[in-house]
Each structure stands twice: as structure tokens, then as C-alpha cells.
């Protein structure tokens, strides 16, 4: 799933949760999508820092 699609789905589920609520399956999906998005952000940020140089790789 592309980042744009991921964000679109996260936003859709957020809006739906505010308007009418989510099913248990949708709540699980929302949590999984958010975690996937955050992992992507962390990975990109780490790669950017490493490209600058002088940053040691640390296990998280």
C-alpha cells in the first residue's frame, strides 16, 4: 500500500470514528495502519539521519 493510500485510509477511519463509530475490525485495522505509517516515518527519518553521517545505528 502506498503512503498516500495509507494516509487516505487512516483519515477515512478517523472521520468515520468521529461521525458514527468503528466496528472492532475497523479499530484493529486503524491501529495496524497507524503503526505501519509510524514505522515508515521512523525508517525514513533514520535513513535521512544516517545519510548526514556521524550517526550511529541504534536498535529500537
Swiss-Prot record:
GO CC aspect terms: cytoplasm
Signal peptide (UniProt feature, chain positions): none
InterPro entries: DUF896
Highest taxon, organism lineage: Bacteria
Keywords: Cytoplasm
Principal location: cytoplasm
Classification via SUPFAM superfamilies: YnzC-like
Cellular localisation: Cytoplasm
Family stated for the protein in its record: Belongs to the UPF0291 family.
Protein name, as recorded: UPF0291 protein CTC_01690.1
Organism classification: Bacteria, Bacillati, Bacillota, Clostridia, Eubacteriales
Amino acid at each position: 500500500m502506498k503512503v498516500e493510500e495509507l494516509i487516505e485510509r487512516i483519515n477515512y477511519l478517523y472521520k468515520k470514528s468521529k461521525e458514527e463509530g468503528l466496528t472492532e475490525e475497523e479499530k484493529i485495522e486503524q491501529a495496524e495502519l497507524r503503526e505501519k505509517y509510524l514505522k515508515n516515518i521512523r525508517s525514513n527519518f533514520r535513513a535521512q539521519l544516517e545519510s548526514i553521517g556521524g550517526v550511529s545505528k541504534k536498535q529500537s
